[in-house]
């Protein structure tokens, strides 16, 4: 683990890591907080679900555009985005209490999702510049993927604590404060990017997706998200079948924790293969690690199997990020990383929806198998398009 100490002792790095963690905690807070708040104010789970769906839709549509704006105009654009995002959360709070029509809350959530500042993507695009040493850069991508897992676990816990203390509106207010404070701290400590990167930004309609490697990685990321989404729903269904609804929280925490541990271990490995080979190997390993979940018959067995299936998740994300850093054209790196987040989240949403329908008809093991099948198709697609993943011999840009 010495590599992580070296990373965090590098100039500015520890503060930048803290800042991005604070800035993206709202990503884990907002969904549950908005769901609970809108449900409380309107009395309708349907309206609450529609509002959360609008938040996700706004993120899916707006995040790549926001990232392209940052690539072309510079990181100073992060703060206006953070302010719009925070304002939308506070408006949902204030107008929700005032009893405005539900469509207003849905619209505000759509705006808030679209304006979420991509500080994490910016930092991922800067690791090579900030650290230089390839060993430290590899470790930084692994550390980042593990911290993402922590954010997804901590966000709902923060919301739950806020609800227990006062109400879901407090979680919305906290999320607004965190996104502004984290973004401000991030911008204060982030060195300026090379000016030529913005001059070389692709002006085409597709932006980062104009590069074939980015298209392949985005395309093969979606089935991974789909598999994760099906398992997210299958685990609570398994717990319900065992007669212990609270078991799902423990299992999901073990799953995320194992992913974080896997990411940290991945970051200190010795490099024996190239970026493409590493990414493809973990892409193949992931569905194989998830497959045994469908055979779990008792809580202890499921606990062991969710940890097994979680181990490759953060390494897969980290290896993917390393590859993107190597192949993304100059001036499009922030957008490239954001497209991958969008692909993952889109896959998650689809996996959640499909798993619910499959569980109703065929049970939770069938949902796991559907997710594993999707991940296997994604791995096969990556293998079949491996030549598109090779860094171009001609300087990109």
Predicted regions and their residues:
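Helix-to-loop junctions at the C-terminal end of transmembrane segments
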Residues: 61-75, 163, 262-275, 359
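C-terminal ends and interior cores of transmembrane alpha-helices
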Residues: 84-100, 285-297
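Helix-loop boundary and gating motifs at the non-cytosolic
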Residues: 2-60, 208-253
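A membrane-interface helix-boundary motif in multi-pass transporters
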Residues: 164-177, 357-375
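A late C-terminal transmembrane helix in Major Facilitator Superfamily
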Residues: 331-362
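Cytoplasmic helix-loop-helix junction between adjacent transmembrane helices
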Residues: 110-148
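C-terminal transmembrane helical hairpin of 12-TM major facilitator-type secondary transporters
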Residues: 276-318
């Amino acid at each position: 683990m010495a590599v992580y100490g070296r990373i965090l002792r590098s100039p500015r790095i520890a503060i930048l890591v803290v800042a991005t963690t604070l800035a993206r905690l709202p990503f884990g807070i907002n969904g549950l907080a908005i769901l609970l708040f809108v449900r409380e104010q309107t009395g309708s789970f349907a309206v609450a679900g529609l509002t959360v769906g609008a938040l996700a839709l706004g993120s899916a549509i707006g995040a790549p555009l926001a990232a392209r704006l940052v690539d072309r105009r510079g990181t100073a654009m992060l703060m206006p985005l953070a302010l719009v995002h925070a304002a939308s959360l506070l408006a949902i709070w204030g107008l929700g209490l005032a009893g405005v029509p539900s469509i207003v809350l849905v619209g505000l959530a759509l705006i808030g999702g679209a304006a979420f500042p991509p500080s994490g993507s910016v930092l991922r695009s800067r690791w090579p510049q900030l650290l230089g040493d390839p060993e430290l850069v590899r470790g930084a991508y692994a550390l980042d993927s593990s911290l993402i897992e922590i954010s997804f676990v901590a966000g709902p816990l923060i919301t739950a604590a806020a609800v227990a203390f006062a109400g879901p509106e407090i979680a919305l207010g906290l999320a607004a404060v965190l996104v502004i404070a984290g973004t401000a701290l991030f911008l204060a400590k982030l060195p300026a990017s090379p000016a030529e990167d913005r001059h070389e930004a692709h002006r085409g309609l597709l932006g980062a997706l104009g590069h074939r490697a980015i298209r392949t990685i985005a395309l093969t990321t979606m089935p991974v998200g789909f598999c994760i989404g099906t398992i997210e729903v299958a685990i609570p269904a398994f717990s319900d079948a065992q007669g212990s609804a609270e078991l799902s929280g423990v299992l999901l925490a073990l799953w995320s924790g194992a992913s974080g541990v896997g990411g940290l271990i991945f970051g200190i490995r010795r490099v024996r293969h190239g970026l493409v080979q590493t990414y493809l190997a973990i892409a193949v390993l992931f569905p194989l690690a998830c497959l045994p979940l469908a055979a779990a018959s008792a809580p202890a067995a499921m606990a062991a199997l969710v940890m097994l299936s979680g181990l490759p998740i953060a390494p897969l994300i980290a290896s993917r990020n390393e590859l993107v850093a190597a192949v993304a054209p100059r001036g499009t790196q922030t957008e490239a990383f954001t497209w991958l987040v969008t692909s993952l989240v889109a896959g998650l949403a689809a996996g959640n929806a499909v798993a619910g329908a499959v569980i109703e008809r065929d049970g939770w093991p069938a949902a796991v198998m559907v997710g594993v099948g999707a991940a296997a198709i994604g791995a096969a697609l990556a293998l079949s398009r491996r030549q598109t993943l090779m860094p171009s011999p001609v300087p990109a840009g």
